[in-house]
Amino acid sequence: MASEGKVLLVASSYYGPFYPDGMNTGVHFAELLIPYQVFREAGYEVQLTSETGKCKFDDHSIKKSALGEVERDAFDNKDNEFWYALKDIKPADKINYKEFCIMFIAGGHAAMFDLPHATNLQTLAQQIYASNGVLAAVCHGPVMLPFVDDTKSPEGRSVVYGKKVTAFNSTGELVMGVSSALRERNMQDLNSLFREAGAEFVDPPTPMSDFTQVDGRIVTGVNPMSAKSTAEAAIKVSQSLRKT
């Protein structure tokens, strides 16, 4: 079967202290796995990348209590093709943007640490978007988007300027008990970050709702429960572009 195209699946490179209980944050397991599976099942090739070519999973995201049946099956089966794709993760500076029709950015609080400063990933996102590609992100993954320039904007604005977007919001941070951990590190909540970038931030009904926003070629989702729907929405947008 011919490939539908190629997706660049982005993970944070950060793995380190964050949670009040002493556990480390990293890329969220389900937010990397589920989009990978959605894209593969739809016939896309998937290349994993991070700024440094390395990633580790958020400690909380791989606790047994956090894994649903699909995630548990993949986590326990190291012959699952996801693990082979993970071994082939490449640093962002080794990626050719011309190969990709979709960039999908996974979350986890780790994204807050490195994606705002991940200049090689930001450049790739800028190039893919300028080439009529789709930028999709879920949970904390959207944190990178305000730092991605829209090259077609004469004012040098970001790709989310004037766009409706969503992400893990300030209410969610309160529910998780990590608002103070963000403040201690001078990290803005995503509501504030997007509004400063000129985007229209759309809050979900609840922090745990499966909720996405699509505005042009920008696709965003709120949380791990939205990983599947966000990836599916990105596919729908990308396929619609072929027909125009």
From Swiss-Prot:
Cellular-component GO terms for this entry: cytoplasm; cytosol; nucleus
Cytoplasm listed as a keyword: yes
Entry annotation: catalytic residues: 139-140, 173
Source organism of this protein record: Schizosaccharomyces pombe (strain 972 / ATCC 24843) (Fission yeast)
Keywords of this entry: Cytoplasm, Lyase, Nucleus, Stress response
EC number: 4.2.1.130
Descriptive protein name: Glutathione-independent glyoxalase hsp3101
One GO term (biological process): methylglyoxal catabolic process to D-lactate via S-lactoyl-glutathione
Listed GO MF terms: glyoxalase III activity
Family: Belongs to the peptidase C56 family. HSP31-like subfamily.
Role according to the record: Catalyzes the conversion of methylglyoxal (MG) to D-lactate in a single glutathione (GSH)-independent step. May play a role in detoxifying endogenously produced glyoxals. Involved in protection against reactive oxygen species (ROS).
Coarse class of the protein's main subcellular location: cytoplasm
Subcellular localization(s) per the UniProt record: Cytoplasm; Nucleus
Covalent S-S links between cysteines: none
Keyword Zinc appears in the UniProt entry: no
Gene name of the record: hsp3101
Pfam families noted in UniProt: DJ-1_PfpI (PF01965)
